[in-house]
Amino acid sequence: MLESLTLQPIALVNGTVNLPGSKSVSNRALLLAALAEGTTQLNNVLDSDDIRHMLNALQALGVDFRLSADRTCCEVDGLGGKLVAEQPLSLFLGNAGTAMRPLAAVLCLGNSDIVLTGEPRMKERPIGHLVDALRQGGAQIDYLEQENYPPLRLRGGFRGGELTVDGRVSSQFLTALLMTAPLAEQDTTIRIMGDLVSKPYIDITLHLMKAFGIDVGHENYQIFHIKGGQTYRSPGTYLVEGDASSASYFLAAAAIKGGTVRVTGIGKKSVQGDTKFADVLEKMGAKVTWGDDYIECSRGELQGIDMDMNHIPDAAMTIATTALFATGPTTIRNIYNWRVKETDRLTAMATELRKVGAEVEEGEDYIRVVPPLQLTAADIGTYDDHRMAMCFSLVALSDTPVTILDPKCTAKTFPDYFEQFARLSQLA
């Protein structure tokens, strides 16, 4: 039996949430700190499953680090160059794409013999486009089970050079190549085929590389130029900003049933594209205020929206459940990459929205949601996907309870999400 959590109807949400650190920023920063010259003090690191998988891998690769008792501060002694394994090594990375993709690239520098594997779902998440690009740069990589999917066996050999990578499936493939290229022997030019999805996530990568002393030139996100033979240098300390995708649930809750909710740790200077989620809520009718270190949202009369959300794929899921409380239909477009995330999020979202009474049209790369007059109480399947669990908590902002199956799946990015959500909520 799966555990479940029933949320009773909520009359009002109000208060402040200090956001946990960003998953995307935490795992990039940990890896760059490990590769850098010098010791880096990382503050506000996320403590979650995906981060633990990265830390376990770095430890197995001989990286020394010290974690604070609450695991949110990490002091990393950089190796000042590539990560190597003296003996053949197997690394288990769970379902952490932010660990699997960058490590698959970085560990192709040098000539170690390393296997990367993970949970069954990780073996269904495509990695072929990244492997193709790494092979163009000389990497020796074997698929151990299914072609184009993990587990992978890496035997080094990556030297840089002229690479092309498909940009349409995941921006993490490009992130992995960008973080690896400065340490390669040769200069690297990366050309993007097709439209690059989730561009703002590339901005996070470039921002972090710059913080660790490396500048990357690019031509409109289509061609990237990286000098080889460089070394990352520790910035000394680095503050991980709050997780903007995690902020989306609290901001949406305020838009639906505020009161006013303030999330801290992100703001108008944030490097994460998912902060643009607040602009979408504003377009729908919520009231939004931005500070340097906070975003605040208050209730408004919400209207349905029709919008391309390729730039905020994770936070866009929150719009799909917010749509239940808007007047008129909502269409979220250009989100094909929902299909290759923790689960096939398009099908999962459509299935569960129908359970609570919505009329849903699921396209190849879009979803259209027509809200019901009255929401239906339902048991929500979460598909081992943290974001499904968090998105559907918003159903309780109606006069109907909702039951979330396997609520602990939020441990991937936000272990105490439901406690934080309850803290803001006044029950009907």
From Swiss-Prot:
SUPFAM superfamilies: EPT/RTPC-like (SSF55205). Pathway: Metabolic intermediate biosynthesis; chorismate biosynthesis; chorismate from D-erythrose 4-phosphate and phosphoenolpyruvate: step 6/7. The keyword Transferase applies. It is found in: Cytoplasm. It is an enzyme of class 2 (transferase). Catalyzes the transfer of the enolpyruvyl moiety of phosphoenolpyruvate (PEP) to the 5-hydroxyl of shikimate-3-phosphate (S3P) to produce enolpyruvyl shikimate-3-phosphate and inorganic phosphate. Keywords: Amino-acid biosynthesis, Aromatic amino acid biosynthesis, Cytoplasm, Transferase. It comes from Yersinia pestis. One of its GO terms (biological process) is chorismate biosynthetic process. The keyword Cytoplasm applies. This is 3-phosphoshikimate 1-carboxyvinyltransferase. Coiled coil: none annotated. Belongs to the EPSP synthase family. Phosphoenolpyruvate binds at residues 23, 97, 125, 172, 345, 387, 412.
